[in-house]
Amino acid sequence: GLEAESPVEAVVRLTLNEQPRDAFVAACMVMHSLSGFDRFNLGDSREKCEHIRRDMLAQLGRCPNHSGYLRAQALIKAADGGCDNVFEASVLWIIKSLYSGRVVTQYPIIIGDNTYFGDIVLPDLKIIVEPDGRTKFGDNEQEVRENTGKWLSRQHDLANAGWRVIRARWHDTDD
């Protein structure tokens, strides 16, 4: 049969040889996919991601003399399976490149009877970074109208609780 590399092997190859952002995004997406990440079951999802990370690091351990070894190790350690898509992973890459404090994906914020999940959160600063995608609002006019109302209510609740929400658009990741 045709021999192919596993997703974990592919991530290790990418982290060793490709551009750091692209490799980081790939590592996040593989973790997300293989873990079946579910924000409503964060403990189990994060545990599965850590198992996948250990597999990636073990695979990387087979290449200790590669010139990109230390960079690959850092990328794998920084990857996060809580990113739902390539855009979120790209934004996370930028944040982790600029900020050394705690960064958490799919961070639950409880306000009254509501639980909101911040896509990318700097909890110590009470900052939520939300990569904006049109798909979050729906596929037709009625869904967009309903979801826009929910979004405005969410924004109001978060702001009143002292959270600052920063919106990121795809073109913000170009540089």
What would you call each of these model-derived segments?
Residues 45-175:
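Surface segments flanking catalytic/ligand-binding clefts of nucleic-acid enzymes
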Residues 1-68:
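Short gly/ser-rich loop at a beta-strand->alpha-helix junction or flexible surface loop bordering the NTP-binding
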